[in-house]
Swiss-Prot record:
Membrane topology according to the record: Multi-pass membrane protein
Designated name of the protein: Uncharacterized protein NMB2020
Keyword Ion transport: no
A GO molecular-function descriptor: calcium channel activity
Keywords attached to this entry: Cell membrane, Membrane, Transmembrane, Transmembrane helix
Length: 227
């Protein structure tokens, strides 16, 4: 009996340690992300414009995004994985830099960026709290999120051809919902012991928060009359 209690306690401590390390690494990951965004915004660097074609730029972004995720996951238990995560977040900061530069140079732009950031933080805190209490089937939610990810990617590619503003807003709203659920799923998976790598968990949470912030920023800019 004592042995069973010890095993349960040790397992609980282990899961809590992974979650704590995940949150800590997630916080650190925003340092290079902020540096990348500030660098790109101050330098006026536009990644897509640098290639002279949005298609080439889009392909390079996809290669960077999924390539880095692959290498981070391959090193998910080592310090190399942490280093690669920092490189990844810096790169993602560079990508969002031009949007921030644009937003900060329009009327009420700083306020809009602040609102998007505050709403993102609120979503994260809310979904993290819900993850501790939810009774949802995480396997079913995981399957739903997989289907949702495919639908969103198809919609993104389709709108590159169509260029419909209303569809772009719908996609942004979809990313907010999808990423919010992803936060809850990832945190709950760590709590349940289904994820033992704080690097992988932090990566998922960073991408989710990045998507929420950028999507909310797009929505708020559109509501403010800015395309």
């Amino acid at each position: 009996m004592q042995h069973d209690v010890y095993d349960y306690t040790a397992h609980t401590v282990s899961k809590n340690t992974v979650l704590q390390k995940t949150y800590r690494l997630l916080g650190f990951s925003f340092i290079p992300a902020s540096a990348g965004a500030a660098l790109a915004a101050n330098a006026g660097f536009n990644f897509y414009a640098a290639f002279g074609s949005r298609w080439i730029g889009f392909a390079v972004v996809l290669a960077f995004f999924y390539g880095m995720i692959h290498f981070i996951e391959k090193n998910r238990y080592s310090n190399t994985g942490v280093t690669l995560l920092m490189v990844f977040t810096f790169g993602m900061g560079v990508l969002i830099g031009p949007v921030l530069q644009y937003a900060l140079h329009i009327a009420d732009g700083a306020k809009i960026v602040g609102i998007a950031a505050a709403m993102t933080a609120a979503v994260f805190l809310t979904m993290s709290a819900l993850a501790r209490r939810t009774r949802l089937d995480m396997n079913a939610l995981g399957r739903f999120l997989t289907v949702g990810a495919v639908i969103l990617m198809v919609a993104v590619v389709a709108n590159l051809f169509l260029g419909i503003p209303a569809l772009a807003l719908t996609i942004s709203a979809g990313f907010v919902l999808f990423s919010s659920l992803m936060i809850m799923w990832q945190v709950r998976t760590v709590i349940d012991g289904g994820e033992d790598s704080h690097i992988s968990a932090a990566l998922t949470l960073f991408i989710s928060l990045y998507n929420i912030f950028s999507s909310l920023l797009n929505i708020l800019l559109s509501l403010n009359g800015e395309d």
